[in-house]
């Protein structure tokens, strides 16, 4: 099990008077993904208690950024653009288009959104498979070593008006 994190997300949120008409645009540099941060592994609990060697961290990062998975050299940025918001605030579902490796995929992102003065926080949790994102999980040694297909995504995004 690996914890992949990215604390360098950029983008914009256009908050409309009718909150359901708001728009979200995010970008993530794939080379900013961090593999197996020790403090984040502790937060994830018992399935992540085992310490991961630097060699394994480096190998996972190389495999993740390689042509067969994220292809960081050709596609350095993942883009996410909301297309609609529904539900009852503060708990909503954001329909979004995620562009990975130049291909767009529709996803539904459950979110809890708090807006106060000039600040907002969006946080949530969702499960996707590699296939949902047009990706094939890494495998080696004829399939003896494989990455789990399920991706559990947890996020907390803060923003403020400019």
Identify the function of each model-found stretch.
Residues 1-162:
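Low-complexity, acidic/polar, glycine-enriched regions of mature
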């Amino acid at each position: 099990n690996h914890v992949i994190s990215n604390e360098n997300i950029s983008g914009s949120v256009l908050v409309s008077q009718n909150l359901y008409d708001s728009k979200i645009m995010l970008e993530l540099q794939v080379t900013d993904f961090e593999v197996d941060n020790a403090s984040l592994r502790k937060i994830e609990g018992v399935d992540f208690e085992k310490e991961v060697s630097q060699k394994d961290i480096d190998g996972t990062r190389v495999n993740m950024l390689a042509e067969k998975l994220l292809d960081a050299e050709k596609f350095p940025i993942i883009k996410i653009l909301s297309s609609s918001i529904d539900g009852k605030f503060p708990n909503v579902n954001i329909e979004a288009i995620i562009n990975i490796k130049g291909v767009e995929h529709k996803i539904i992102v459950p979110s809890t959104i708090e807006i106060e003065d000039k600040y907002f926080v969006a946080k949530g949790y969702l499960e996707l498979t590699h296939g949902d994102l047009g990706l094939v999980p890494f495998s080696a040694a004829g399939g003896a070593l494989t990455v789990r297909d399920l991706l559990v995504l947890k996020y907390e995004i803060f923003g403020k008006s400019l």
